[in-house]
Amino acid sequence: MDGPPSPTRVPPSYTDGPPSYVDTPIADEDTMSVPGNNSSLRLLPQGQDEYRSISPPNRVSPDRYHRPAASTAYSSRPGSSLGRAPSIPLSSSNPRSPIRPSTPSRVSTDWTRPPAPSVAYEPPDINGSPRPGTPSSQYGGSPRRPLPPAPLFSAKGAAAETTIPMPEPESENDVFVDNYSIMPDNDPRASLKSAHSYTTDSTFTEDDDITNEKLNHYGPAPEGRQDRRGLREAQMTKKEVRLINGELILECKIPTILHSFLPRRDEREFTHMRYTAVTCDPDDFVVKGYKLRQNIGPTMRETELFICVTMYNEGEIEFTRTMHGIMRNIAHFCSRTRSRTWGKDGWQKIVVCVIADGRQKVHPRTLNALAAMGVYQDGIAKNVVNQKEVTAHVYEYTTQVSLDETLKFKGAEKGIVPCQMIFCLKEKNKKKLNSHRWFFNAFGRALIPNVCILLDVGTKPDSKALYHLWKAFDQNSNVAGAAGEIKADKGKGWLGLLNPLVASQNFEYKISNILDKPLESVFGYITVLPGALSAYRYHALQNDPSGHGPLSQYFKGETLHGRDADVFTANMYLAEDRILCWELVAKRDEQWVLKFVKSAYGETDVPDTVPEFISQRRRWLNGAFFAAVYALVHFKQIWRTDHSLTRKILLHIEFIYQFISLLFTFFSLANFYLTFYFVAGSLADPTIDPFGHNIGKYIFVILRYVCVLLICLQFILSLGNRPQGAKKLFLSTMVTYSIIMAYTTFASVYIVIKQLTTHALEKTDPNNPYKLGNNIFTNLIVSSVSTIGLFFLMSFLYLDPWHMFTSSAQYFALLPSYICTLQVYAFCNTHDVTWGTKGDNVMHTDLGAAKAIGSGNTVEVEMPSEQLDIDSAYDVALRNLRDRVEVPKPPVSENQLQEDYYKSVRTYVVASYMVCNAILAMAVSEAYPVGSHIGSNFYLTFILWSVAALALFRAIGSSAFGVINIVSAIAEGRIQAKFERIFGGGDERGRHRAGLGSGFSESGKTGITSGSGMSGMSLSDVTSKISEKFSWMSGK
């Protein structure tokens, strides 16, 4: 009890001496926990926070009846005696309120200590008000702590000199004894009442059983959204801020709690958030003199990697999934300590730009996540600056914390390194193309990065995905774009595959990443670099001096209006990520190529409902179709490039492959019907009917009429209904198509088994039914098995075969829906070139306005002033009726012309699509009626073998991609090992002795560095020179 006092911690701001309450040691349970290297943080309010009352005014906590309280009124009370009051613990049987974090606990038992001095030690702030946390006069002037509110049962006329008797520690009436009464005999206050009753006059004693008392009902709980209690409301004040070059630029301190657990506070970029109100178009950002932190002061740095994250109205879970993945990738860059480009301070060469498309559209919880990281602060943005409308709000901050998907903080203790962030909050919703214009033309021109990476919110990149993308540019200076592998998010424990839509998309993504992307990468032209995970070389995107180039063509789709907006061009820009691909490869006098990087993968959410799935594929299919047509029509541009002859020949081979694929896509509706017609119709033959009694024929006739009617219904639905409004109808058609596909698959399997077990269908050579030739075994079995077998083979070669077992059945069941539902809906909505975000939000002001004056009860309006004006208007109305004055017709608006043009083109496209498929289906079905021999059906043979040939072509290209990667890896490893042995083990000093700069590590901006001996040739250039016989794998 009388041991030496604990040492006190005196803040440095107490220049004249500490106040009396600092002598009390701080209890662990009452202080805010700020761990140094723990993964979890307790963000508790500080002691200086002001709190609103968290309980109703007529309700008193039971704990308050056991507290000593003064009977004086607060208005006339001098100093509080609580500075010498003991902390009286409660009995374990009594209810107790939780300890308030804002109240320091007193654990000292020295009750004979003199009262607190009346001199205040803390200086006031610049406004003369007490500092936060300093007891002010409104609490009675006590330096101990803010006093609680006055007791509800205190008498109003209490004497000022009334105090509570405090016994000595040796007294027989110990305050820690249960039967000690803490109330004086002459206390004028009313007697204490039961904790659960406010109507009786009985004193609350130990004998009272409060558990059996009847509780009073205080009405129902409040409805609707309630303000959170216990938090201090933001107090806004007016300040004079000097404009910088006529623009509003603010340096705002970060929140105190965030500042308290930051590992680094030595630079202003860690302690202040920079806000800029941009009032110009993104193309004029640099011209108007706007600068980013990387362009000014001590934070002036070169940017090697510029990451763009675009979002619309996604929630905090999707945002944190993407952002935490980026933070893990930046940590991996910093872990590469042997690199000349990266290393410990590699984060200084990486800038992350988050662009939100519309201030009113962004999700509030996403803003909360950004605020928790210190990037965003509410209440400082303005709509108008210096009579100029703000177009974008730019927030800059170097954050040191990250939020994972579970919204838990991760800091330096988990390997998180600082991250330079730019948050661009666009004032209006202007679609994704405009967001990319802010990224490339505004911030890109200010930073001049080497590589730009594009991500969508919701995509979770692997911890090394961004490094592998960057490495593709570092190894080959001719690479202009790189595509990563997109994987479907299968959910926890792959439970998402129980949804057939998710499973079918998982299979589709896998086959594309195993067969299609590697094939196109070998040729050097990838038809689509996915916007969810792709990268571009910033220098390759730039326009020529005349203003013509990839970016100018890319952003053309943002300004298309009226009849000048070609419907083909408008639809092509729905899949905007396909535009840059063609423009880069076909750039005049250049030799840029595109590359697929399989090791750079990321997971993304896929649509799991029918309306969302159809709407997404409508944009993709239309954009892919019209972009492919555009590339095929303009293939001559390849001859104006600087590509080698071998590369040009390979590109033309790819164009032929794309043309064949485009034809199959256009006639896919007829091919599906004919395949069903011939295969399912074979069971109508009585000789092979599996059911007998002509049941196979009846089933075929029914399914045939259902299929035809369903296709007609699909056109009607697609022309007149949205998927969101006719969800059940679209779902019903997809289920029916799956039933038809299931019966067709059953017929194929039955025919194959029948062919392999009996000779009933093969009359030409009964001794050898398995020979190759024009028979069922060759045309049906070999072609089908070869197609599916190639899928299995390539999946096993890439060591990723699980989708064949978990998702292939769902994909083949939904394959008719891909053709008949998605393709038909896409062609029937070619006129719709919007993203579903437009609306008539223009306010018309031709009628004037009623302006409020005074207190708001009266308004000011314009009305006819004289009776003559009223009579004149009436006379005009009568004269117009009598003379039948012709009313001039308003001219057709620009929007109406555009809509009419788009709908007319839609009509031509749908009519051509429908008529061509109908003619093909009718002609072939008439040439080969039902019951004809499948082995002699030339068209079915052509279809089956064409599919097998295309699959084989894709498999050969995919295999070549794998072989090239293996050869490049072996050559690169051998050359690097050789130079490390010659030049001192490959360390930095050895490379400088050889005059190679950083060419045999991560080099620099273009894959070529400025060494002294060999002009800093990168490792890929040396490898390319040694392996000239593989010239088609290099960039030349």
Swiss-Prot record:
Keywords: Cell membrane, Glycoprotein, Glycosyltransferase, Membrane, Transferase, Transmembrane, Transmembrane helix
Keyword rRNA processing: no
Phenotype when the gene is knocked out: Leads to strains that are hyperpigmented in rich media. Does not affect growth rate at both 25 and 37 degrees Celsius nor the virulence in a mouse model. Affects the separation of yeast cells with enriched chitin in septal regions and increases the frequency of enlarged cells with multiple nuclei. Leads to increased expression of CHS2 for compensation.
Domain of life: Eukaryota
Conditions for induction: The expression levels changes little with temperature change, regardless of whether the exposure to the higher temperature is for 3 h or 24 h.
Localization: Cell membrane
Enzyme Commission number: 2.4.1.16
SUPFAM superfamilies, alphabetized: Calcium ATPase, transmembrane domain M (SSF81665), Nucleotide-diphospho-sugar transferases (SSF53448)
Membrane-traversing stretches: 659-679, 699-719, 733-753, 776-796, 808-828, 908-928, 945-967
Entry's Gene Ontology molecular function annotations: chitin synthase activity
Biased composition (Low complexity): 86-108, 1001-1019
Pfam families per UniProt: Chitin_synth_1, Chitin_synth_1N, Glyco_trans_2_3
Region (Disordered): 1-153, 189-229, 994-1019
Biased composition (Polar residues): 194-203
Chief subcellular location: membrane
Membrane topology: Multi-pass membrane protein
GO biological process: chitin biosynthetic process
Residues with attached carbohydrate: 38, 179
Its biological purpose: Polymerizes chitin, a structural polymer of the cell wall and septum, by transferring the sugar moiety of UDP-GlcNAc to the non-reducing end of the growing chitin polymer. CHS1 mainly responsible for normal yeast cell reproductive growth.
Family, per entry: Belongs to the chitin synthase family. Class II subfamily.
Designated name of the protein: Chitin synthase 1
Organism for this UniProt entry: Exophiala dermatitidis (strain ATCC 34100 / CBS 525.76 / NIH/UT8656) (Black yeast)
Gene coding for it: CHS1
